[in-house]
Regions:
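Positively charged, Gly/Ser-enriched RNA/tRNA-binding surfaces
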Residues: 1-42, 86-253
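Short terminal or interdomain "cap/linker" segment that borders an active site or interface and mediates
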Residues: 46-89
Length: 253
C-alpha cells in the first residue's frame, strides 16, 4: 500500500440527485468544508481544485479532436504527473489522436487560469459559465477562498460529465482529501431513471493522516442518546424528544 491508501478503508459519500444547476455542486462542497471545519481542519490547510469536463471537451473540439476520442483523452490526461509524458502521448495515439493533436491536448494541461481557458474556449462557453456560477455560489457560502480553477483535475472515472473537483492539502503531502463531480448519465446507464446528479466522497485514511500531521486536538464527542419506545402511540413523543435533544447538540438515535 502507499501513503494515504489502505487495502481496506471507509468512504463517506454525499450525493444530490435531480438538481441540474451548479447549486448542487456548491452545496456538497460547502458540506465538505463544514465537515472538515467540524474536525478542526483549518481552511488554510487545503484547497479545492475545480474544473469542468465539458470545458475540456470544448477545448479538444477546438483543436479538431472528435468527440468520440474525448473519453480516452480524459483518461490519458488524468495521468499527468503520475506517468511520463511519453506514455501519456502513447495512450492518446492509441485513442486515435495524431501527433499534432497529442501535443496540443497535452499542452491544454498547462492552462493556468480560467481567463486563459476562456480565451481558447470563447466568451460564450457554457462550461466557463458553469464554473463562474459555481465560484459565485461558493463566495456566497463564504468558502470562495477555498476553491481554485485547475484544468488538470479530470477524475479518472468515465462517468463524470461536468464539474469535477478534488481537495488537496496545501503542503502536497497526501493524496486527495475528497473528490467528486457531476455524473448526469450514470443512473440511466446502470438501468435507473435518468436524472442529473452530483456527488463527492471522503476517504477516512487521508483525513485521519491530515489531522495527525496538523497535530489537531481531539474534538469533543457529542453525547449519544438512544430513545426507545414500546408502542406506536409513543412515536410522536419520542420524535419530539429526539428533536429537542438534537437541538441541544446531542447525537440521537
Amino acid at each position: 500500500t502507499t501513503k494515504g491508501r489502505k487495502r481496506e478503508h471507509y468512504q463517506l459519500n454525499l450525493d444530490i440527485i435531480a438538481e441540474e444547476s451548479v447549486a448542487a455542486e456548491a452545496e456538497v462542497l460547502f458540506a465538505a468544508v463544514s465537515a472538515l471545519r467540524k474536525m478542526g481542519v483549518p481552511d488554510e490547510a487545503y484547497r479545492i481544485r475545480v474544473s469542468n469536463r465539458a470545458l475540456l471537451s470544448e477545448l479538444l473540439l477546438s483543436l479538431g479532436v472528435k468527440e468520440q476520442f474525448h473519453q480516452g483523452a480524459f483518461i490519458a490526461l488524468d495521468k499527468k504527473g503520475k506517468i511520463p509524458r511519453e506514455q501519456i502521448e502513447a495512450i492518446l495515439r492509441e485513442e486515435g489522436l495524431d501527433d499534432e493533436a497529442c501535443t496540443a491536448a497535452f499542452n491544454l494541461m498547462d492552462i493556468s487560469s480560467l481567463e486563459d481557458a476562456e480565451k481558447l474556449a470563447g466568451e460564450g462557453s457554457p462550461a466557463i459559465k458553469q464554473i463562474r456560477e459555481l465560484f459565485a455560489l461558493l463566495d456566497a457560502y463564504g468558502i470562495g477562498n477555498q476553491a481554485v480553477f485547475d484544468i488538470s483535475v479530470i477524475r479518472g472515472l468515465s462517468y463524470y460529465t461536468g464539474i469535477v473537483f478534488e481537495a488537496f492539502d496545501t503542503k502536497g503531502e497526501f493524496r486527495a482529501i475528497f473528490g467528486g463531480g457531476r455524473y448526469d448519465n450514470l443512473l440511466s446507464t446502470i438501468g435507473g431513471e435518468a436524472a442529473p446528479a452530483v456527488g463527492l466522497g471522503f476517504g477516512d485514511v487521508v483525513v485521519g493522516e491530515l489531522i495527525k500531521a496538523l497535530d489537531l486536538p481531539s474534538t469533543e464527542q457529542n453525547e449519544l442518546v438512544i430513545i426507545g419506545y414500546m408502542a406506536d402511540e409513543q412515536r410522536v413523543a419520542a420524535t419530539q424528544l429526539a428533536a429537542r435533544l438534537r437541538g441541544e447538540g446531542k447525537a440521537v438515535s
